[in-house]
Amino acid sequence: MQTTINKKAHYIPDELKELKLTEYLREHLNLTGVKNGCEMRSCGACAVLIDNKTMRICHSTVKDIENCEVLTIEGMENEDGTLHPLQQAFIDYGAIQCGFCTPGMVLTAHALLLSNHAPTREQIRKALQSNLCRCTGYQQIIDAIEAASVYYK
């Protein structure tokens, strides 16, 4: 089975196709930005992009990404190793505290901004409705996404 994860081609042996995708990414590829939160696709901690769409993968298996392009938070950085402008905006606007929800929030926002380069605050809120944060509240997160949207134009 073949897939692309963070812009790199991966061949995955058949014996791993039934493995939970979160386990494969975390344990086999050391992509620990993918979190196991609620295990019910409700909190957004397990969010990644699959073919540029946000997917909650806590119930997915490796076979679900065959021939797909997968992006985790580790694949967001720029080619020179610096943070993506959206990641930097989360830092600059104080949208990170404990960090558990941050990868899912950033990837959900990235998918939104890829499809809508100038979302309204209400559109940002709606996009984040399945991402839970217990620390920051959402004001700083929305501010960060709004500020970063200029980099998507």
Segment roles from a protein language model:
Residues 1-153:
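Signature of N-terminal electron-transfer/Fe-S-associated modules in redox systems
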